[in-house]
From Swiss-Prot:
MF (Gene Ontology): heat shock protein binding; histone binding; protein-folding chaperone binding
Species of origin: Mus musculus
Region (Required for histone binding): 171-248
Protein name from the UniProt record: DnaJ homolog subfamily C member 9
Keyword set, alphabetical order: Cell membrane, Chaperone, Cytoplasm, Membrane, Nucleus, Phosphoprotein
SMART domains documented for this protein: DnaJ
Pfam name, any one: HTH_DNAJC9
Entry-linked PANTHER family: DNAJ HOMOLOG SUBFAMILY C MEMBER 9
Gene from which the chain derives: Dnajc9
Gene Ontology BP terms: nucleosome assembly
UniProt GO cellular component terms: cytosol; extracellular space; nucleoplasm; plasma membrane; protein folding chaperone complex
Length: 259
């Protein structure tokens, strides 16, 4: 079965960009980060034993997808014709995709994350990320709160204040999803976050864990599949920041909203 058919069967779409969760116009860096994010969710080392076979299959397919979109010639053919060269060396099914992945991405620790959080919160980078997320998601606070790094539900008033000030200063447009968000939606988001925090605390107590980095890591690994995926998604974003190529320089400037 060809790569496109496999993607349709396993991920529900034959669109390689959709498989990685990125736009067709995505830059090389965005494609790389998209691959990192989705591959972390199915990395065989991060799932339970009974899920390893399915995760390994998905992981291998994702590696092949990235191999196409990271190769200029193959990407050009796919963009123009919607086909992939199944005989290319990069799509060899016997390739060690785990070794390939580890060559691309540096592993970081939870200590790295904690150190990053201390410098990130309140920084110019966080400010730009919040405004960018606001533009990307057209003011949808559910998605903004999920996408900005190191954010907890208790940060929402601070995040809203940053966005409101940016709207008032005409830096960003006033999307109705933000300025007219219902209290019902706000309360639902708060309840979800509180339930998740309660679930984490219960899991910690059930495992007899004290608070701390090593125990937090053990707790993350013990959580339910959906929460594991969300944490992996967070780690993917963190690792993407730590793994930026040095020549890539600074983050691209905040996009201006087109009229």
């Amino acid at each position: 079965m060809g790569l496109l058919e496999l993607c349709e069967q396993v991920f529900g779409t034959a669109d390689l960009y959709q498989v990685l969760g990125v736009r067709r116009e995505a830059s090389d860096g965005e494609v790389r980060r998209g691959y990192h994010k989705v591959s972390l969710q199915v990395h065989p080392d991060r799932v339970e034993e009974d899920q390893k076979e399915d995760a390994t299959r998905r992981f291998q397919i994702l590696g092949r997808v990235y191999a196409v979109l990271s190769d200029k010639e193959q990407k050009a053919v796919y963009d123009e014709q919607g086909t992939v060269d199944e005989d290319s060396a990069g799509l060899n099914q016997d390739r060690d995709w785990d070794a390939y992945w580890r060559l691309l991405f540096k592993k970081i620790s939870l200590e790295d994350i904690q150190a990053f959080e201390k410098t990130y919160k309140g920084s110019e980078e966080e400010l730009n990320d919040i405004k960018q997320a606001y533009l990307d998601f057209k003011g949808d606070m559910d998605q903004i709160m999920e996408s900005v790094l190191c954010v907890q539900y208790t940060d929402e008033p601070r995040i809203r204040n940053i966005i409101q000030k940016a709207i008032e200063s005409k830096e960003i447009p006033a999307y109705s999803a933000f300025v007219k968000e219902s209290k019902q939606k706000m309360n639902a988001r708060k309840r979800r976050a509180q339930e998740e925090a309660k679930e984490a605390e219960l899991s910690r107590k059930e495992l007899g864990l004290e608070e701390g980095v090593d125990n937090l890591k053990a707790l993350i690994q013990s959580r339910q599949k959906d929460r594991q995926k969300e944490m992996d998604s967070f780690l993917a974003q963190m690792e993407a920041k730590y793994c930026k190529p040095s020549k890539g320089g600074k983050r691209t400037a905040l996009k201006k909203e087109k009229k």
